[in-house]
Amino acid sequence: MQKDAVNDRAKAGIFMSFQNPISIPGITVENFIRTAKSTITGENVRALSFKKELKEKMDELSFDLSYAQRYVNEGFSGGERKKNEILQMSILNPKLAILDETDSGLDVDAVRIVSEGVQRFHNEENAVLIITHHNQILQKLKPDYVHVLINGKIVKTGDASLVREIEEKGYDAYKALA
């Protein structure tokens, strides 16, 4: 899969958000997501129905509709960039969403909004993998599984209670297992 082009991965139903999403000058958020959706589905995305869906999803994320006409992530705060990634995920509706440090640098309100966006998205037909070093987002999401990864190796797996154990012991307690 690593050798596949990004658009092939997207067509296969894989979405990846990044810790520090890049800006794309000259491309509006609306145009970017609509083009991505069209490319992934292989169908022409009708403007009117797309605008309705975009507004609905932006409202859910407390994201002002004016951001749809701004260039992707240009001048966005860290929280706005993360909300934009959750917006993309919710509209593109992948089978697997990999969220890399989605909670990094977010204030309490932004963590709540992003967490709620992930909860609305997640269902029995998709999966969400959250990569994080902090437990704040995990407390809100209540993960089914928690894995501790040290030096590229999963050294411990558990349920949501493992988050509390990590909080108490710290990651150093797991380094010997690697």
Regions found by a protein language model. Name each.
Residues 1-9, 73:
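ABC ATPase NBD Q-loop/coupling interface
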Residues 145, 149, 153-176:
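Conserved beta-strand-loop-alpha-helix hinge in the C-terminal portion
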Residues 111-124:
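Helical segment within the ABC ATPase nucleotide-binding domain
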Residues 125-141:
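Conserved H-loop
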Residues 98-102, 109:
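Walker B catalytic motif
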Residues 19-24, 133-134:
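Catalytic "switch" loops of ABC-type ATPases
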Residues 22-95:
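ABC-family P-loop ATPase nucleotide-binding domains
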